[in-house]
Amino acid sequence: MASSKNMPSRITQKSMEPPLRETWQQVVQEMVMRKQRDEEEKQNLVTGKEKSWVSIDLLGTKQEGKRQKVNIWGPWEKWGIKIVWVMLWVIQLMLWGCLIWEMGKKHSCNAEEVIALVDDPGGFQKVKYVESVPVTCMTKNFTQWGCQPEGAYPDPDLEYRNISQDILEQVYKQEWPWNTYHWPLWQMENMRQWMKENEKEYTSRNNKTKEDIDALLAGKIRGRFCVPYPFALLKCEEWCWYPANINQETGHAQQIKINCTKAKAVSCTEQMPLAAVQRVYWEKEDEEGMKFMNIQACNESQLRCKTSPGGCVQGYPIPVGAEIIPESMKYLRGKKSPYGGIKDKNGELKLPLSVRVWVRMANLSGWVNGTPPYWSARIKGSTGINGTRWYGIGTLHHLGYNISSNPEKGLCNFTKELWIGGDRFQYQYKPSWNCSQNWTGYPVWHVFRYLDMTEHMTSRCVQRPLRHNITVGNGTITGNCSVTDWEGCNCTRSGNYLYNSTTGGLLVIICRQNSTITGIMGTNTNWTTMWGIYKNCSECKNSTLDRTDNGTLGTVNNINCSLPHYNESNKWTCAARNSKKKRDSLYIAGRDFWGRVKALYSCESNLGGLDGMMHQQMVLQKYQVIKVRAYTYGVVDMPKAYREKNMRNKRSTEISRPRKKRGIGLVIVLAIMAIIAAAGAGLGVANAVQQSYTRTAVQSLANATAAQQNVLEATYAMVQHVAKGVRILEARVARVEAIVDRMMLYHELDCWHYQHYCVTSTRTEVAQYVNWTRYKDNCTWQQWEEEIEQHEANLSLLLKEAALQVQIAQRDAQRIPDVWKALQEAFDWSGWFSWLKYIPWIVVCIVGVICFRLLMCVITMCLQAYRQVREIRYTRVTVVIEAPVDLEEKQREERDGSSGSENLEHEKRTSPRSFIQIWRATVQAWKTSPWGKGWKKILYMTLLPLLTLQIWMEETGWNGDKRCKKKKERVDCQDRESMPAIENEYVELS
């Protein structure tokens, strides 16, 4: 029973009763829940957490679960998530935009613009002073002539480089200049020296002597002139001429410029004779080169001469001011010019040319029997025709022979002379060529001068009109006429007419063939001024300049009242000078309207007359010396990482030294100065450049390819330009060498290679005086030179700024501050110690006063001793000549009226002492005096000879009897009792 009571009852509550029937799904769910509770309990035991809290509601039901806490930040978290989400989208859009913007840029890497030297195959620099360019010749006979063998330089016909027309125009600006090349002058000097050295040997020769020298004299030895790298020759292949600087008063062209439109760069010239004497006919191999010198007028210039009957002038214009033989080789000039029209105003070659000279290959098609056209129609004995004066018509000098100007005659006469420049040498030789041959077809030089220099208006030379043949047209001239516009002017009758210009001056219009205007001369002087001068001429008040029908061209009524001019005394006159029934022929010139002109022709011409030197000089004018530049300046983008890496690697190899970090202001100024100096950089290599050429660069140069050599050459040139800038600063700033050393030591000027560029550390933003960005990616050397020329005016400003930067850099670079200078700047001590400059004068004055006092002391002591010794002498003399008894008796006798014969006898008994006696007495007196003792003894001993001499002279009477008498009277009148007692007076009396 008891056991049965203790057992639980099977009867439970309805809720606790198991379901009668459970589904499978309920069973699985219950098992899962139990499993989860077990795992949760295990996890709590492991982590040490307490068991979930238990709550009992009012019905007594247990509720297990976690406590639900209230979150007060819930709303904020909800909106914060949204804000963060929006910000992330904004950042994402910004990143996408930056990415798209960077992709749109040319360079996506982080870089900075730096100045660099880039490859420029067509770059070159013109050389203004060709005297400094090295040159050599190349020929087959190189051993005899001292030249290089053929093949030493590239053949210009096979190896050359074309130059674009844009670069030509940019560099030379449509002006191909004249150059006086020194190479032909050297050849001429060698020939002249060789002839002078062998001048004595030539006297033994005859005309049968034949040797190889005739080939040299005749110009058979041909060769080329070549220049070494980096120099080259720019050969013009197409050119034309055009006028420039037209004078608005006279109408003449002050300059004729040459425009080269096609050229190529070569190393050597064409074949030409290396040396030759004066000749007329040249070889047919030279015809092509001579014909090229017949330059025609440019088509774009629209010159008036193109529509004139004679056309425009053809030839090469040697400009006004050209110097044929420079001053350094003046010994080659000679007395007179041997080249015909190529001469100065005095007919020599000492001065530059005063008139433009044209040289061309002669066109002899219209010549008849060796004379120019219409030569037979000239006035008999005249040397000119159609306004041109001809020289050398008839006979010409050709290689030592007088040859006819008619090439078909073949007349030759040997002159036994060779003309080389202005010198003539006697020489006998038998040429291997035939002088008497038919020279038709051989090229000849034609030299002519247009004295009025109006080639752009007409090519016809006119005979200048006489002044009395200039008249007023009176309706003959119509239209608008001026010296620069001939097209609007018309004439109806041949003559020389005075006409008003449309510009306000006066014109002389030359009309021929009743309708053709062949020349117009002008001046700014108007009609009113001219007429006032005309009326002031004597006998011309009632005269006019109207035309009379005397002559074909007409003349004035009174020939003594012609157009005014300046006479030989530089005074106005209207009449020509008369002398012995002869009258001066006065003409009017285009460039000298009021002058006294006596030249009839406006042109001068001659055939031949040129030697090998002038032939080479003319042919070489188609060449210009240039300096090849295989690089140019540009702006490139250098990655900063690459730059920093190279700088770090390079500096790690050097010895690190502690220094104060400074700015790059000095480097900037030096770089700018180097840039400014680049256009005029010298041809030599500076020592600084050689030192900066490191061992690594030399090894790289030895192993480099062609492209790398260009890069290294650019590097070399950049450093050379910097060195040139340093040399410029050296002349203006002190101690630049130390600054350059500091630059090199601190690597403030570096150069490295990046994508075939030589890049410096100078950034573009610091180059304030050069617009680098203008030439980015397409900068050429020519553009660089043009940019440099525009900034040369800032050179003084740059030098001042450079000097300031140098001073600042020197101040910052000092390790120990200069305390003295700092104090001097803080306190102006300049006026405090200004009196110190007088200290030397004060010292000199003090020393001078001391010396003067010492001298006066010595002199005073000497004078005092002299007086005392002299007083002793007088005392002794007084005792010697004293006779007390006799004096009293004599006085008494004289009072009694005696004649004084006793006195005379007594005077006869006393005789003057000798010099030795006086010397002894003086020495004895000196010994007994205080001056003969102590340190003064030697000093005053020097006075004894002088004192003895003076006493002896007084004794002998040389100083006069008057003094002796006075002494005697003074002694005789003395009282005996007043005289002192002397110890040795009896010694003297005996």
From Swiss-Prot:
Region described as Immunosuppression: 729-745
Transmembrane feature ranges: 839-859
Gene Ontology annotations for the cellular component aspect, listed alphabetically: host cell plasma membrane; membrane; viral envelope; virion membrane
Changes after translation: Specific enzymatic cleavages in vivo yield mature proteins. Envelope glycoproteins are synthesized as an inactive precursor that is N-glycosylated and processed likely by host cell furin or by a furin-like protease in the Golgi to yield the mature SU and TM proteins. The cleavage site between SU and TM requires the minimal sequence [KR]-X-[KR]-R. The transmembrane protein is palmitoylated.
Positions of region (Fusion peptide): 663-683
Record topology, Extracellular segments: 108-838
Lipidation (S-palmitoyl cysteine): C862
Site (Cleavage): residue numbering on this chain: R662, G663
Coiled-coil blocks: 695-745, 786-821
Cytoplasmic topological segments: 860-990
Glycan attachment sites: 141, 162, 207, 259, 299, 363, 386, 402, 413, 434, 438, 469, 474, 480, 490, 500, 514, 526, 536, 542, 550, 560, 567, 703, 771, 778, 794
One GO term (biological process): symbiont entry into host cell
Positions of region (Disordered): 890-909
Assigned keywords, A-Z: Cleavage on pair of basic residues, Coiled coil, Disulfide bond, Glycoprotein, Host cell membrane, Host membrane, Host-virus interaction, Lipoprotein, Membrane, Palmitate, Signal, Transmembrane, Transmembrane helix, Viral attachment to host cell, Viral envelope protein, Virion, Virus entry into host cell
Signal peptide (residue range): 1-107
Self-association state and partner proteins as the record states: The mature envelope protein (Env) consists of a trimer of SU-TM heterodimers attached by noncovalent interactions or by a labile interchain disulfide bond.
Functional note: The surface protein (SU) attaches the virus to the host cell by binding to its receptor. This interaction triggers the refolding of the transmembrane protein (TM) and is thought to activate its fusogenic potential by unmasking its fusion peptide. Fusion occurs at the host cell plasma membrane.
Name of this chain's protein: Envelope glycoprotein gp160
